[in-house]
Amino acid sequence: MYINYLKDLIGFKSVTPESDGAIEYIDDLLKQHGFKTEIKIFGDSKSEQATNLYAVFGSNEPNICFVGHVDVVPAGNHELWHNASPFKASHQDGKIYGRGAVDMKGAIACFLAASLDFIKNNTGFKGSISFLLTSDEEGKAKHGTKEMLQYIYDQGHKMDFAIVGEPTCEKEIGDTIKIGRRGSVNFKLNIEGLSGHVAYPHKANNPLPCLIKILNELTNIRLDKGTEFFQSSNLEVTNIDVGNNTSNVIPASTEASFNIRFNNLHSAETLAKQVEEIIKRYCKEYKVDYKLEYSSSADSFIQNPNDKIKDFADIVERVLKIKPEFSTSGGTSDARFVKDYCPLVEFGLLSETAHKINEYTKISDLQKLYDVYYNFLMEIL
């Protein structure tokens, strides 16, 4: 059934933060199989509203919760897709093409099939199964999983273990389990100099030499050497703007943006302090003023592999005959919110085609993911 579920889900044009009926489709399906469900819409303005679903079967412990998102990134030029239709699943050569196939409607389809089959085959099992789904993960992630977690806990619900269905695997299904994520902090630096004619530099103060020195040091500094589960923290310059299209004018100001992806040796605050010390030193040398702003969308986190995390890894190895690696690589995900409530793993399909034109998953990979999810439920519940 996971193939049919995936095809149906791809058919919803759920570009973030829109659900376009995907949440409602899952809600109806789960209701038909005895789940208690609730849809909540959070967000003040229409453009920011997110549709969220919590569904639960059973009331006993332990509760295994699948956390995911139905929203997808824009599909780009539709003409470049198979059948020129990214929101109509295309089944070719043992693959299913469509926006969201791996990120992450494929994982949702697999857990839907696994959980419904498990319930059918195991009446009276000892625990409970739940879904927490949102249409707001690929965008701002303000009114999705974060708000829904707080809401369901206020209602008395509890999760004992969560599976976040992000596309985590690198080369084959089962090679990677995420147990943490790097943090992310964005910086915007504005340096104010004094404009003037390029022929009279002594009557001006060009802010660019100062910025060049700052960025050179920032991009060459070694923030750390990494840890057991984390690669070293990394700074990338993302934009430089002087707003000057004239070749004979020294600019009055310049602006640069950069991002740091950091491990658990840092926080956004400690990095901001380190960055500002460098900026302050060069701005004093060049006698220019500066303004530094920063915002963090996620802190770094890491979980020590507990019994259920190890159980999950053992299931992967037993079912797929591959020993998974614990990893923290990649970007941010909603796992950063879930980790405050319960232990978790992130485990899904291959990440190779996520967000790309002609995103696809192999049907054989869907079967493998289904097998892992089903066998984990059998082991724990």
From Swiss-Prot:
Catalytic activity reported: N-succinyl-(2S,6S)-2,6-diaminopimelate + H2O = (2S,6S)-2,6-diaminopimelate + succinate
Chain positions recorded as Zn(2+) 1 binding sites: H69, D103, E166
Residues at which Zn(2+) 2 binds: D103, E138, H355
Transmembrane segments: none
Pathway: Amino-acid biosynthesis; L-lysine biosynthesis via DAP pathway; LL-2,6-diaminopimelate from (S)-tetrahydrodipicolinate (succinylase route): step 3/3
Domain of life of the source: Bacteria
UniProt keyword annotation of Chaperone present: no
Keyword Signal among record annotations: no
Essential cofactor(s): Zn(2+); Co(2+)
InterPro entries attached to this UniProt entry: ArgE/DapE_CS, Bact_exopeptidase_dim_dom, DapE_proteobac, Peptidase_M20, Peptidase_M20_dimer, Peptidase_M20A
GO molecular function, one term: zinc ion binding
Example GO biological process: L-arginine biosynthetic process
PROSITE patterns reported for this sequence: ARGE_DAPE_CPG2_2 (PS00759)
SUPFAM superfamilies in UniProt: Bacterial exopeptidase dimerisation domain, Zn-dependent exopeptidases
NCBIfam families: dapE_proteo, PRK13009.1
Family that this chain belongs to: Belongs to the peptidase M20A family. DapE subfamily.
Subunit note: Homodimer.
Function recorded in the entry: Catalyzes the hydrolysis of N-succinyl-L,L-diaminopimelic acid (SDAP), forming succinate and LL-2,6-diaminopimelate (DAP), an intermediate involved in the bacterial biosynthesis of lysine and meso-diaminopimelic acid, an essential component of bacterial cell walls.
Listed name of the protein: Succinyl-diaminopimelate desuccinylase
Organism: Rickettsia felis (strain ATCC VR-1525 / URRWXCal2)
